[in-house]
């Protein structure tokens, strides 16, 4: 194999990358099965309390007041305008809304909280959301498998799916290890990671397919190195700009966007890695050749009639 000038030998360390991938995947799965996922109220059920303040509310201050009143599990979010606050708590107490409003009124008499509504989300609804979220993920992966298989070839499809599964496992493993609350926003982030990673993978796959036509004497490993190097600047620019935007959400978005930002941040890094060292390596394992990309020709029928 001849490495051209300007081409990085990405596949030269594929065995080391595979070992790293295996270790990280085992750690992620181990955390997943031992610590479990810290599901939020969207999936476990609980009480939703909407409060209205006379003046704009400081969410950090409200959260501190609730902790001081003994409600450590309360999740505080802005809702509507700056005076509306939504409090989520894992409790079935029908009097909880009044108790929370009273505690906040006593903590800050200058800007009292008025109870607007109280709703209880049962665990059955949460389980239904959880099942639908898992089903949505499976349907997304199935659709991707069909699309890539139709658009490219089944070997590409398998490489793409394995890389996406890896990304989802790594993200869920990190969320499990640090016990980040998994709610609907985090689920949306995981699905967004799947789409982002697939986009990276498709860009490289498209260049690999094109280079099979252009670089007829190059073997598969050389083709993968050249194709990845040719798309490297695009990959770096996209990943860095995306990570900078996510970092802004992570540091300035507050607690409400923390899980969402963490899932996206980890997912983008994992997706960039997997598009090179999982999706491409699968093509090597499956021994992709240029003949795999040539559509079968219809056999010519021979007229035996005299």
From Swiss-Prot:
Q: Where in the cell is it found?
A: Cell inner membrane
InterPro entries given in the database record: SecD/SecF_arch_bac (IPR022813), SecD/SecF_bac (IPR022645), SecD/SecF_CS (IPR022646), SecD_SecF_C (IPR048634), SecD_SecF_C_bact (IPR055344), SecF_bac (IPR005665)
> What name appears for this protein in its UniProt entry?
Protein translocase subunit SecF
Pfam families in the cross-refs: Sec_GG, SecD_SecF_C
- Superkingdom per UniProt: Bacteria
* GO CC entries: plasma membrane
Q: Which HAMAP family match?
A: SecF_B (MF_01464_B)
Q: Where are the transmembrane segments?
A: 17-37, 134-154, 158-178, 185-205, 232-254, 268-288
Q: How does it assemble?
A: Forms a complex with SecD. Part of the essential Sec protein translocation apparatus which comprises SecA, SecYEG and auxiliary proteins SecDF-YajC and YidC.
| Topology of the protein relative to the lipid bilayer | Multi-pass membrane protein
Role, per record = Part of the Sec protein translocase complex. Interacts with the SecYEG preprotein conducting channel. SecDF uses the proton motive force (PMF) to complete protein translocation after the ATP-dependent function of SecA.
Q: Which UniProt keywords apply?
A: Cell inner membrane, Cell membrane, Membrane, Protein transport, Translocation, Transmembrane, Transmembrane helix, Transport
Principal cellular location given in the protein's record: membrane
Protein source organism: Pseudomonas aeruginosa (strain ATCC 15692 / DSM 22644 / CIP 104116 / JCM 14847 / LMG 12228 / 1C / PRS 101 / PAO1)
**Molecular function GO terms recorded:** protein-transporting ATPase activity
